[in-house]
Amino acid sequence: MTTDSSMPATVIGKAEFSNTKAASEFGTNLSRWRLNVDNGRHMWEYLESEDEARKRPQSILEKYWLGLPYELPARPRATRALEAVENGWEFFKRLQTADGHWGCNDDGPLFVTSGMVIARYIVGIPIDSHMKQEMCRYLLNVVNEDGGWGLFIQSPSTVFGTVMNYCMLRILGLGPEHPAMARARNTLHRLGSASATPTWGKFWLCVLGVYEWEGMIPLPPEPLLVPASLPFNPGKWWVHTRNVYISMSYLYGHRFSMPPNKLVQALRDELYDIPYEQINWPAQRTNVSAADRLTDPTWIQRSFTSALTTYETFKIPFLRRRALNEALFQIETETRNTHYLCIAPVSFASNMLALYHAHGRDSHWIRGMRDRFIDPMWLCREGLAASGTNGTSLWDTALTVQATIDAGLAARPENQAILRKALEFIDNSQIREDPLGVHHVYRQPTRGAWPFSTRDQSYAVSDTTAEAVKVVVLLQQIEGFPSRISDERLQQAIDLILGMENAGGGFSAYEPVRGPKFLELLNITELYENVMTDNLYPECTSSVIMSLTTFAREYPTYRARDIQACVSRSVDYLLRSQYPNGGWFASWGVCFTYATMFALQGLACMGRNESNCAACQRACSFLLQHQNPDGGWGESLDTVRFKQYLPHPDGSQVTNTAYAVIGLLAARCGNHEAIRRGVAYLMKEQQDTGEWLPGALEGVFAPPGGMRYPNYKFHFTLMALGRYAAVHGDECLAAQLV
């Protein structure tokens, strides 16, 4: 490392973040917030008194996520990859929580928090004043210049984003004459007013009592009565679409709406550009603003909407009653299986309203969900918002452990206490049983799985299970680590992974693809694409290949033929799914660089690389083609929508660069200089604290929506640097750092 006798003993890290003018009037004393954790669960708490705050000083972790300054020992500037790893790890290990995991926000979609706030308002559960302030601050920090909000942060204003967050801010106490509300209202009316919101927005306005059910595309619950073998049964749909639809159909079937009150009456006046009583509601069913609609409706979708409307006119009462009872059973079982969390906050909110309608506010259902409201909430630099899930606890922890193994950190005695704690968390997070009513409620078996977030959330995910198995096998091989997770439990996980394979090879996320692709023709979300069924993903498939081959080396006799056949089919899928441009397309990260990183690692497990595989040659050529002059890579989120590599307008990004370097190293790319330049870019972007600063949105959820995965800039970068040193030696890169 470069040393300097004049180097300060400490360095101050800071967020380099400031509130917008509108947000600056809101917020709380950030020095009073503390993060409580429990087996991956996150609960931000505001300490009311100065005495409490003194007794429990803020940690570096809390200060970092809140955007407060923090003081750390100064680190010499790295000139070698492993020195950068050392500096990065010295910082990142401080973000481990008390229960052993690495957690963070995965916010981005701008309708999740608003749905939860609307649901809580309707049920009559007040929100703590400090949470209200921070929710307001978040929205006013991510507001667009025109005063509106989009589908996700950093996206153009839409009716859906604007009307949902307008209603949320009014519920939280902002008056209609507040400058932020006036600007939002002007944008809303310019885009077509609330009547032009998509179906999801119409639903939320209906339950709030500020839109009429006659203006909705019908959402009948009767598909639940269709034989499970037919594609129109929700059991054949993507798991998130299924969960949202079931609760929406229950509330639609009952025409549930909040009784009018003073705020509801005011919103009826504020949200529309004509008097509420004069709106022709049936004419609004397919009225969706051009700013919201992803594609124009097809004649099939128009015909489907007409058929639903006709059916609703002539519905059979006893079938409707049966369907509503079945919907309620599905909602109750989902809530019970997930310990009141539900699969994600979007369906949590609509499920809460359904259970409130069925059982009342004093039921154990609502009490249990009230206590879980905090779980997906994360207090980040902009304020408080719901994440897309109840966190990323298991996923980020597994990737972090992998990074320490790759960089040789895990074998060092000074790191083993930290990583034993991480292993303990992974141990505690494995799901040990199948869900109640597994087949009736369309669930994939979960015994032996690892979840994306927490065991309580209880959903099996193919790649999180795969990554967990891989790091458990590797970590438990290292001297000094206990064998916390038995051979039997690892074998259960392998059984589960093998059971999730799709016919013909390849892996989805939550469950094998169940429905035919033509269901996408009936997609009435207007907002998203490819959300009617699950899909095959190169990133999930590659994680499975890496996991199975790692497991097979340690346990060569367990289901050897099944594993070999699955890996072979998975490799065939990767070769089939490569794009003509040479890359692979991701659905969970941005985008070609992300999936290509995974695919090249998966192919490398079977000995395929640039020297012997045409697919790897094309992939290396693709990545090298898009390297920027500064040595980095930067890919725009717009790639997800347009299906072609688009450079990021702000230039190179740490995450995309790490992905590309990992992929090129996995493929044994012969262009050492290009890889060296990528590594040098990562080292130049490292701060004096050892951290890397936030950049562009890292993740994708339901294309084209973007979301944050802020830990990606740490563990993938540490992986890239560690693997570079392992492959090319820990050479001095001082000349490249000038």
UniProtKB/Swiss-Prot annotation:
GO terms for biological process: ergosterol biosynthetic process; triterpenoid biosynthetic process. It is an enzyme of class 5 (isomerase). It holds the Pfam family SQHop_cyclase_N. The active site is at D463. Its EC number is 5.4.99.32. It catalyses: (S)-2,3-epoxysqualene = (17Z)-protosta-17(20),24-dien-3beta-ol. The keyword Translocase does not apply. GO terms for cellular component: lipid droplet. Keywords: Isomerase, Lipid biosynthesis, Lipid metabolism, Repeat, Steroid biosynthesis, Virulence. Protostadienol synthase which cyclizes (3S)-oxidosqualene to (17Z)-protosta-17(20),24-dien-3-beta-ol (protostadienol), the biosynthetic precursor of helvolic acid, a secondary metabolite which promotes virulence. Belongs to the terpene cyclase/mutase family. This is Protostadienol synthase A. It comes from Neosartorya fischeri (strain ATCC 1020 / DSM 3700 / CBS 544.65 / FGSC A1164 / JCM 1740 / NRRL 181 / WB 181) (Aspergillus fischerianus). The lineage of its organism: Eukaryota, Fungi, Dikarya, Ascomycota, Pezizomycotina.
